[in-house]
Amino acid sequence: MSALQFQRQLGIKRYETAFLILHKIRAAMVRPDRDRIGLEWPVEVDETYVGGKTKGEGQGRHHKTLVVGMVEVMPRKKALGPDPNLSSGQRPQHQGGHGRSFIAGRLRLQVVPDRKQETLEPMVLANVQKKAEVRTDGWTGYDNLHGLGYKHIAVPIRGDQAKTDKHLPMIHIVFGNLDAWLLGTHHGVSSAHLQGYLNEFVFRFNRRFWPMVGFESVLKIAVQVESPTVQNFYEAARESKDPTKPVPIG
């Protein structure tokens, strides 16, 4: 739900108030003690640029924000196992996968400043279990993953759609869904607050088989995390105007 729609439905006078409330909720969508993915299943890792083309600037990416994504690839029949956020006796509401034998498992998304090795390696270390099988597109930023204790499988893709569909299908499905969600629901977002929207997308994605437990999960997490303040958001907005940093997108 966009802040504008939220404002209208609740009858909130100021848009800024609705915006702040939603971001406080998004702050409660990331468990501070969440575990790393890839304990049982391979993990696809790739990056994408989020944001639209700036008018008159062709395909230039300096007005886009770089996001790294990591997603488990798991057998479809395993997708409906127990969820740590479910109360005892609850069952998932629906299945997914559209007939595929493998589907996307747990997801992580993170805004990053660049594609350098010193940026990407810490992202993998923080989110993916050691000894996990990690699949990438051959980008040099991941060259040392084997030395860090991962089973690294790199396949140079270089824009080949057939190779992408075969080697990294799930993360690119995720990226497509993310773009559609940001544009369709929020009509584009500011780079200053993009991570909050990514957190919401990941929260919804990881609970898509249990949509009715989202509220319960947010309440559990909310008592563990610090809520952002108005000052936090104004500081983020000021930083986004720095010409050396991403500017609003969408």
Residue spans for each PLM region:
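Residue-level recognition of single "structural anchor" positions
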Residues: 1-250
